[in-house]
Design a protein with these regions (language model features):
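Glycine-rich flexible loops
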Residues: 1-100
């Protein structure tokens, strides 16, 4: 629900080059956040506070995932229920991210 437009992901690229900058700019046309493989994350928001909030939320989600990835999946939210949740809160979401 926090990232209804998703998060862009780039594979490892040589840092400090035009190619990683151009690839990031292309992803930013579609996403507010781009994860750079083996580097870090790039984000954009309306304010610096919003941007840091987005990045910190991704970091926390990644921590939770890494701590629980080895556990059996229980009580996951079904895609149909996720649609109900985002519609309840009026969040625009990408239908192509769900298996409906």
């Amino acid at each position: 629900v926090v990232f209804p437009d998703g998060i862009g992901v780039l594979p490892w690229m040589l840092c400090g080059t035009n190619s990683i900058g151009e690839a990031t700019a292309k992803k930013m046309e579609e996403f507010r956040l781009v994860i750079w493989g083996m580097h870090g994350i790039y984000g954009a928001g309306k304010t610096m506070d919003e941007t840091f909030g987005l990045i910190e939320t991704v970091e926390k989600a990644a921590q939770i995932y890494m701590l629980t990835a080895h556990l059996p999946r229980k009580n996951t939210i079904k895609d149909e229920d996720m649609v109900k949740l985002v519609e309840l809160f009026g969040v625009k979401y990408r239908k192509d991210f769900l298996d409906l």
